[in-house]
A protein has these predicted regions:
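A polyanion-binding, active-site-adjacent surface
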Residues: 1-154
Length: 154
């Protein structure tokens, strides 16, 4: 599971995907908390909470220099762990991992990265307006089905 950055809840609890977005993510995947953490190693584009967005809605997107400072860790984790399934969550994680842009063009699709299957998801944050569109919610449901099928296979 590859996200953008830790949030406030994650920093306080020292565990990824602990806040509302994590609960939504687990609901999409039909996994309880224990199953989720037993199934996925969680990483992110950056290692530190970037702070609140200047608009006050959601978290600030890490700057390109912040992203580059943490790229070593992402590359190292991928080499060491050698995952069979990678789920980038949100536009930034998808761009950093696959070099692709546009959630509507990537969510619900399956990609290959080395020996790993990659299935992107949108970020489950309430700050994202992308999920308000019914067509996008269907793409998200499709991606969740693909991920569950991949989990059954690996």
């Amino acid at each position: 599971m590859f996200g953008q950055a830790p949030g406030v809840a994650e920093g306080a609890e020292r565990r990824p995907w602990r806040g509302r977005a994590g609960r939504t993510l687990r609901r999409w995947l039909k996994l309880d908390e224990d199953e989720f953490y037993a199934t996925f190693y969680c990483a992110s584009v950056t290692r530190c909470y970037p702070g609140a967005s200047p608009s006050g809605r959601g978290d600030r997107t890490p700057t390109p220099p912040e992203q580059e400072l943490c790229a070593f860790w992402r590359d190292w984790e991928l080499r060491i762990i050698r995952p069979r399934l990678i789920v980038p969550v949100g536009g930034l994680a998808i761009r950093r991992l696959l070099g692709l842009t546009g959630l509507a063009d990537t969510v619900g699709n399956r990609y290959e990265l080395g020996d790993a299957t990659v299935v992107p998801l949108p970020h489950p944050s309430g700050a994202s307006g992308w999920l308000k569109d019914p067509a996008n919610r269907e793409l998200t449901a499709k991606a969740a089905r693909v991920i569950r099928a991949e989990l059954a296979r690996v």
